[in-house]
Amino acid sequence: GLKVLKYTFTMNFEEIAKKMCAKGKGILAADESTGTIAKRFKSINVENTEKNRLTFRQTLFSSKAMKDYIGGVILFDETIRQKTLIGPTIPDLINKNGAIPGIKVDKGAKPLAGSKEETVTEGLDGLRERLKKYYKLGARFTKWRAVYKIDDNYPSSQCIKSNGHALARYASLVQEANMVPIVEPEVLMDGPHDIDKCYQVTTNVLNECYNELAIHKVNLRGTILKPNMIIPGSLCSKKVSAEEIAKKTLDCLKKNVPNEVPGIAFLSGGQSEIEASKNLNEINKINDTNFLITFSYGRGLQASALKAFGNDQKNSNAVQKAFEHRAKMNGLSSKGEWSEGLEKAAAA
């Protein structure tokens, strides 16, 4: 196993960014905070203890899907420090299975002073020191999430500017520490807005982010963008096809994301597992850019596995089977080779 570690550790951040989004692979978001995983466990009647969190995550990280379909895993502070129940640390286990360990470094979205319904992401204080520690623990990439809600007056330019500035300062510090920053500006799908409103807001958000990244001298070749897809709000009465979602999403990326960015890994943002795979597949079917377009899913990869864990916490086989199926489906989507037929055949 050590050979793998040494190899990863000598790569520079541009090479790591490429490896994380290699064709047919994506990123597993397993960085739920203790509060968020509490909600997930509650829904399956599992007690939210450190041991249960470790058992569930370790089961995913040791699955054979890791080698084939997962390029990187985003961890939470608790998880990157944990020893597995079978010996090595969690980052060692992930490395051994061919993926790159990463860490969420933001401290959460906090109320934005002067705009009480919006948030700004905190976590810059002490970040330089924390990054050194995470590097020693094995992390080679990081994540920071900014959140924008759509409403009549939102997102405000205050929110778009504050979050863009924080994302850029974060990214600059991360590259200084020789790691890859995942830049995640999430325009939420909550609300009744239509797909065109999502397009327009996402355009403004991406523009501001890339302006700030340029000001802060971030090397875009060593970054990954984790954006939302261009989709209608969850309460929008006008439904749209996966084809339209793909067309508008790709168009928005082409117009607003600089060419140097090597990889774009979508968040699933509350889409169902199947929707998330189908939409990603449609985007890749028409992808005529140099971007490697893939997934960075949390629930989009874990929902079925969580259900299996709820049914029987001792049955790691069932949990791994559910996870392997989703990872494989999304691996296919990242190449534009997914189909409903394969979905059903594999699940049978």
Q: Residue locations for each model-derived region?
A:
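Short, Lys/Arg-enriched N-terminal segments with co-localized hydrophobic residues
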Residues: 1-10
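Alpha/beta catalytic barrel-like cores
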Residues: 9-137, 150, 238, 242-248, ...
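Conserved, mostly hydrophobic/aromatic
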Residues: 49, 144, 183, 225, ...
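Alpha/beta enzyme core
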Residues: 58-62, 87-95, 100, 119-141, ...
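Short glycine-centered, acidic/aromatic-flanked micro-motifs in structured strand/loop junctions
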Residues: 105, 146, 185-187, 227, ...
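Conserved radical SAM core fold
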Residues: 108-112, 147-154, 188-192, 232
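Active-site-adjacent beta->alpha loops and helix N-cap segments on the catalytic face
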Residues: 150-161, 193-196, 271-279
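A glycine-rich phosphate-binding loop feature that marks nucleotide/adenosyl-phosphate handling sites
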Residues: 224-230, 341-346
